[in-house]
Structures are given as C-alpha cells and as structure tokens.
C-alpha cells in the first residue's frame, strides 16, 4: 500500500467529476465536498501505513503450547509471589531480652510512687511522677516528656530503658541494692488481701486508715493513711495524708454518689481512686485480682 494508490484514486475521482454538469450555484458546494473527501482519503492512507509499520517492528513470538503429558502449560509464579501484593506477614516477636538484674540506679528525675507487679507483664502497672505530673504506665510505655521506656515492673522497682541501656527506678522509700524480687508475687498478695477483706471487712484497718474530712460542716473527702501493715498501702501508690475525693468517677463528697461507689467497691476487682495531694489531683489505679 503506497502513495501512488492515493494519487490514482484522486485522479479517477477528478475525471469522473468533469463529466458531471454543474450549475453556477452547486459548483462551490461540489468543490467543498470534493476537498473533504480528499482529506478523508489521505488520512485513511496514512493510518494504514502507520499500522503496517508497527506490525513490522514487533518481534515474532511463538505461541505457548502445553508439553506432552501435561494438561496445561506450567507458569512460573515465583516472580508474582515475590511482589508481596497483600503485604508481608510479620515475623513472630522474638523473646524479650533479659532484663539486667543489676541495672544501675537511674539518674532520671522521676519518682516511682506505686507498682502493680503481675506475673502477666501486660497487666503490670507503674505509677510514676515526672515534672509534677503523675501517670500510670504499662510495659513498653514511655514516661511522659522523656525517652525512658518501661521494660519490667517488680514489686519494689521498675526497670526502664534509657539511651539504650537498662536502669533501675526504685519505689519511693525503698533502698537501691536489694535483691531483685520475683514478678507475680503481688498478684497472690492482692488476691489474698481481697479474700480476707471480703470475709472480714473490719480487717481493712490493718492496711488502710480512712477518716472523713469536713470543712464548715461540708464533706471534702476521706483522709488516707497506712495501717499497721503499710506495705500494700505503699505499693498501691498512695502517700500518707492523701485525700480520696472520688472512686471510678463517683464523687465521694456527694452522699448519693458515695453510696453508689461503696456498692461498686464491694464486688470490684479493680478501681480508680482520685486523691488530692498537695493541692493536685492524682488517679491511683487499684487492682485486686480474684
């Protein structure tokens, strides 16, 4: 298919057009139609030429044929499998690195006010104050405003990771250098305390002294102090002369809400006590395992 084909076609059309009688009014229209026809023929010719050249440039490829003894052609899908179209499965987390039992005492300006050490690390909680703000932290949490991460919680200390090394943050009042306690002992202790108190509520005074505080005849809270056995009081993150103002968000200064709070506490295994300490409010988490 070549250019002479287009010229012969146009010459034939012109020869035929000369034999057609044209009036004065139809002649301009005739030439307009003739030009449009010629333009269309030229465009068609060039498209055919381009198509032929593209087909000639494509390399020939043999058709895939199934080999004898097989029902269908075998395809190599290894390349597709390496694309990770649906993402990559996360590898199972490696066992946690052993915590340094002799980790040096931290220089971090933070105070460990309470711990809830559990045999299940996910349930362990550390109550830490830093820059005047006290919060509860679990394993893997970063202490607010620092790069220190909680590594493990024990009954009298917390191991934190700071600048790539383990450090020890002792419970306030405890002496650094004591043997590392076994995690999980506090679970059994809290469980036994709960059972004891349910059987004999009067035993609460062995662990906690509670006294109502009134100002001008108005209830403002309940003063909390350790009992004859102060260990549990300290481990819960309470401080002498803390004043409890709410339990689980129920205001203890309101008689109706205080009664509701007491009903909840009777069968609760955990609670959040809000205390007022030196003019600031702190939330103290208390867990009593069954």
From Swiss-Prot:
InterPro entries in alphabetical order: PDZ_sf, T2SS_GspC_N, T2SS_protein-GspC
Q: Which UniProt keywords apply?
A: Cell inner membrane, Cell membrane, Membrane, Protein transport, Transmembrane, Transmembrane helix, Transport
Which regions span the lipid bilayer?
29-46
Q: Which domain of life is it from?
A: Bacteria
State which ranges are Periplasmic (membrane side). 47-290
Concerning its family, UniProt says:
Belongs to the GSP C family.
Q: What is this protein called?
A: Type II secretion system protein C
Q: What is the organism field in this record?
A: Aeromonas hydrophila
Q: What is the lineage of its organism?
A: Bacteria, Pseudomonadati, Pseudomonadota, Gammaproteobacteria, Aeromonadales
């Amino acid at each position: 298919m070549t250019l002479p084909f287009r010229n012969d076609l146009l010459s034939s059309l012109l020869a035929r057009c000369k034999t057609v009688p044209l009036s004065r009014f139809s002649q301009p229209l005739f030439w307009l139609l003739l030009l449009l026809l010629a333009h269309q023929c030229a465009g068609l010719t060039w498209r055919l030429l381009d198509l032929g050249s593209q087909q000639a440039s494509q390399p020939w490829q043999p058709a895939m044929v199934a080999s004898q003894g097989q029902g269908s052609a075998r395809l190599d899908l290894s390349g597709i499998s390496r694309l990770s179209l649906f993402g990559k499965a996360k590898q199972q987390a490696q066992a946690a690195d052993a915590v340094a039992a002799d980790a040096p005492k931290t220089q971090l300006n933070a105070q460990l006010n309470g711990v809830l050490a559990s045999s299940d690390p996910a349930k362990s909680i550390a109550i830490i104050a830093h820059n005047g703000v006290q919060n509860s932290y679990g394993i893997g949490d970063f202490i607010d405003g620092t790069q220190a991460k909680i590594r493990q919680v024990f009954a009298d200390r917390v191991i934190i990771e700071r600048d790539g090394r383990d450090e020890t943050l002792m419970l306030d009042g405890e002496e650094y250098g004591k043997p590392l306690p076994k995690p999980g002992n506090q679970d059994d202790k809290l469980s036994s305390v709960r059972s004891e108190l349910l059987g004999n509520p009067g035993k609460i005074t062995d662990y906690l002294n509670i006294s109502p505080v009134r100002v001008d005849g108005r209830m403002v809270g309940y003063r909390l102090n350790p009992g004859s056995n102060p260990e549990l009081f300290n481990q819960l993150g309470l401080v002498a002369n803390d004043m409890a103002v709410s339990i689980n968000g129920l205001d203890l200064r309101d008689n109706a809400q205080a009664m509701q709070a007491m009903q909840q506490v009777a069968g609760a295994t955990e609670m959040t006590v809000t205390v007022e300490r030196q003019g600031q409010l702190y939330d103290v988490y208390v867990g009593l395992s069954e």
